[in-house]
Structure formats: C-alpha cells, structure tokens
UniProtKB/Swiss-Prot annotation:
<dbReference type="InterPro" id="IPR036388">
    <property type="entry name" value="WH-like_DNA-bd_sf"/>
</dbReference>
<keyword id="KW-0346">Stress response</keyword>
<dbReference type="Pfam" id="PF03444">
    <property type="entry name" value="HrcA_DNA-bdg"/>
</dbReference>
<dbReference type="Pfam" id="PF01628">
    <property type="entry name" value="HrcA"/>
</dbReference>
<comment type="similarity">
    <text>Belongs to the HrcA family.</text>
</comment>
<dbReference type="InterPro" id="IPR029016">
    <property type="entry name" value="GAF-like_dom_sf"/>
</dbReference>
<dbReference type="InterPro" id="IPR005104">
    <property type="entry name" value="WHTH_HrcA_DNA-bd"/>
</dbReference>
<dbReference type="GO" id="GO:0003677">
    <property type="term" value="F:DNA binding"/>
</dbReference>
<keyword id="KW-0678">Repressor</keyword>
<dbReference type="InterPro" id="IPR036390">
    <property type="entry name" value="WH_DNA-bd_sf"/>
</dbReference>
<keyword id="KW-0805">Transcription regulation</keyword>
<dbReference type="InterPro" id="IPR023120">
    <property type="entry name" value="WHTH_transcript_rep_HrcA_IDD"/>
</dbReference>
<dbReference type="GO" id="GO:0045892">
    <property type="term" value="P:negative regulation of DNA-templated transcription"/>
</dbReference>
<dbReference type="InterPro" id="IPR002571">
    <property type="entry name" value="HrcA"/>
</dbReference>
<keyword id="KW-0804">Transcription</keyword>
<dbReference type="InterPro" id="IPR021153">
    <property type="entry name" value="HrcA_C"/>
</dbReference>
<protein>
    <recommendedName>
        <fullName>Heat-inducible transcription repressor HrcA</fullName>
    </recommendedName>
</protein>
Amino acid sequence: MLNKRAQILLKTLVERYISEGQPVGSRSLSKFSGLDLSAATIRNVMADLEDMGLVASPHASAGRIPTHQGYRFFVDTLLVVKPLDVIEIHQLQDQLHPDNPSRLINSASQLLAELTRFAGVVVSPKRNSAIFRYIEFMSLSEKRVLLIIVTPEGDVQNRVLFTDRNYSQSELTEAANFINHNYAGCAIDEIRTRLQSELKQLRQDMTSLMTAAIDAGDAAIRENSEAVIVAGERKLLDVQDLSSNMASLKKLFDLFERKTALLQLLEFSRKAEGVQIFIGEECGVVTMDEFSVVTAPYRVDGKMVGTVAVIGPTRMAYERVIPVVDMTARLLSSALSLH
C-alpha cells in the first residue's frame, strides 16, 4: 500500500501526463503536488513507484509516465470523478428521446463520441431467447397476414405470414388477444412448449396461425438481435497519442469491423454493476494494448439488456469519460423502459 505522500505524487504525475502528454519530471511534481519536498526526495519516491511497476522512464534523462498498472491504481484509488454539468445532462436528455428504439441506440453512440471526442459504442439488447411485449395481426390480401411484433425494448418488427386460408380481421384480433393475454413476456421457446398442450381446444387452423406467428416472431427478433453500433471512430485519428501509431489504429478499426471480439470484450460489462474500466491488456484483446475501454450496462424494466462504452487512448481524462458513460447508460435505460 502506498503512503499518502506517494499517492499524492502518483496522482499528480498521472494528471499532468493526461493533461500534457509529456513525461513528468520532479520539478513539475514539486510545483503541482502541493508538497514541500526536495527534488531528491521526489526522485526517491519516483524510483520506488518505478520498482512497483506504477511508473516508467521512457528515456534515461526524461521524467516518468504512468504504466497501465499505474493507471489502474489511479482509477481505483485516486481518481476524483467530476459530475456532468446541467447543460450536458440536458443535452443527453434531449437527444435520448427519439420515437424509435433503433434511433435511440444510434443517438446514444453518437452522443458518447461527441461528448468524449473518442469512439462511442452501444451494444443493442441481447436476446438469448426471443421475448415479445405484444403482437398484432393485420389482414392483407388473400391468404396473407401481416404480423407486427413489439419487443420489450419497444422495437417493432414486421413479418408477412402466408396462410392456408383467409382470416377475417375479427379472427386475427381474437388470435392476437389470446397470445398477448397468455404469453406476452414469455420466452419463445417456452411458448412453443405450451402451445402443444394449451391450444388443443382451438380449431386446427387457428393453432397453425399462432404457431406460424410464434416462429416468425422468433426469427424476426433474433435476426435483429445484438447489433454493435460504433460512432466517432474517426475522432481517434485526432488523438495525438494514436495518430502517430497508425498500425495500432488500423488494428482497432479492423476490430470495429469484425465486432465479434468487441462483443466479447463488452460482455464483461453485463456481469457487473455500474461503470467498468479496462486499461490496455485488461481488455483481453491484443490489438487494444494502447487503449482503454469505459463501459456500463443499461437496462429495460430493471433487466440488463445491453452495454454502452467509450474507447480511447489509455491517456484519457477518466474523470470526464466515466460520468458521460454512466449518465448515458442511465438515461438510455429510462428512455427504453418508457417504450
């Protein structure tokens, strides 16, 4: 455990390095730490921090910079998070109110990018087993029925069913009411099992319609499940630490394209409460050793369904990014729960 003096010097070093991007020497530490210490004492403390793996010397004659381990100690122990100001909160609230949940997800990723100047990522709700809030049937032309499925997140999917006979609108309404009353909020796999026994009392043609609707609804919901929306990738080109390492950026952009590894990384966020921070190799992806990821899960009706994240350099203003991610997740949860 670091003593108070070492903690203050490490905190000062990390903050100065994040702010200026240059190795921090003993003179700067003496000036900004508020401690009345000699240069020799500061150098001794820095040597101890280096032995502990918290700081490193990029050049023999230069100052020191934080290591990934140093960033981790800073984030876990020393960081003071700055709350968002009222104007920024209102900006988030105003933007996270579109009618369509898909636009809501896109708006969230764009806001994350705009407010942090890094890449904003939102993973849309994951559905291990498709669930619907309610369905509607609408008669089209001969032997064609429009199935309208509304998910718990408020997303709307449409499918056309080809039927063995024509159905009146009253029959379709009766079938939809039966399904909504008995099965709304249930997993599709559970509904299929229950249909086998519970629909025996209905006419065979009505049973066929309902079974077709459940199958089509399952396909529609799963087909549109768990997309990864990334916004602001190009903003990373403006980050000095990254623009000088195009090979690393190219690998990150490839990761954005593939998205599978990105999903695996963000999956960790679902397993914990609140904001999670992954620094460098903690991301578990070789191509992200120079990056940090700040994530938070969002919910619909209290259930975790997706993730928001910001991806940027390890030298990021964590005290700024963390509240942006946290507030975006909270407001997205509220907006989706209203649908």
